[in-house]
């Protein structure tokens, strides 16, 4: 069954979503961008005695073409930024020999509500240039991608220490 499912749901060149596709002729001769592009930034503070990093401000901008459901699109972006914050600050698989010691939700460190910044700015760019309905693009979770690098750069700017690896 796996081959049948993969073949049915695969996205060959020109296919946008589901079973529809864009013909490569006329104004659609080049496959258009269908996914969300995003930019993120953050400000952090570092406790010089403990080394604890706290995120003070977070900003995200996502180009979604058109947010058919703006609350959902905003939730996707802020949730993705929070996941990226976890990657940049907390998440780490810890082993003793070959045994994973933090393999449960009780032991694996994820962001808590208390870790979230007090100031969040979220913007959706909606210029209706997507190939989806009414100019929508495939929005969701693009703000995840750069968060760990944002945190590393903010730490370098704050205390002059370059982080080159996520926890």
Language-model-derived ranges and their functions:
Residues 1-167:
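Cofactor-binding beta-sheet edge motifs in enzyme active sites
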């Amino acid at each position: 069954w796996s081959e049948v499912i993969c073949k049915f749901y695969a996205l060959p060149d020109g296919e946008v979503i589901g079973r529809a596709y864009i013909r490569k002729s006329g104004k659609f001769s080049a496959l258009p961008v269908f996914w969300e592009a995003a930019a993120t930034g953050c400000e952090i503070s570092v406790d010089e005695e403990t080394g604890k990093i706290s995120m003070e401000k977070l900003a995200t901008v996502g180009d979604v073409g058109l947010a058919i459901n703006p609350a959902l699109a905003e939730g996707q972006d802020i949730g993705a930024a929070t996941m990226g914050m976890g990657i940049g600050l907390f998440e780490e698989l810890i082993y003793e020999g070959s045994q994973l010691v933090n393999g449960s939700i009780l032991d694996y460190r994820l962001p808590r509500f208390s870790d979230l910044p007090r100031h969040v700015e979220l913007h959706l760019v909606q210029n209706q240039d997507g190939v989806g309905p009414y100019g929508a693009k495939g929005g969701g979770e693009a703000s995840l991608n750069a968060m760990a690098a944002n945190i590393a750069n903010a730490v370098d700017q704050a205390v002059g220490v370059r982080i080159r690896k996520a926890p």
